[in-house]
A protein has these predicted regions:
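Charge-rich, low-complexity N-terminal segments
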Residues: 1-101
Length: 101
């Protein structure tokens, strides 16, 4: 499954990149395939491992902020593998333009 998640520490100030960096380090250590985007992180893996990772990330941010907003979008397709790159490649193969990804 794929999951896109965004964790926002409320009241942590204008720049949250130091906290985001800690989350990315946690995600990277999970050994799950992921992509960091400007607005969130996309992770690919099995249900339990992905949700466990997001829970750990939420708790990590919660240690730095009294209030945290976490948004999760899940795409769960039976039998699908390597969708993190595969979904993008599928769209690129149908276009006749260079796509930024």
């Amino acid at each position: 499954m794929l999951a896109t998640f965004t964790i926002i520490p409320i009241g942590a100030g204008e720049s949250i990149s130091p906290i985001v960096a800690k989350v990315v380090k946690l995600v990277d250590s999970s050994n799950l395939d992921y992509r960091l985007t400007a607005m969130g992180t996309i992770v690919e893996g099995e249900w339990d491992e992905v949700l466990t990772l997001i829970k750990k990330a939420h708790k990590l941010v919660r240690r730095h902020s009294a209030r945290v907003l976490t948004s999760i979008t899940i795409d769960d397709r039976k039998g699908a593998k390597n969708r993190l790159a595969g979904k993008v490649d599928s769209v690129k193969s149908k276009l006749k333009i260079e796509v930024k990804s």
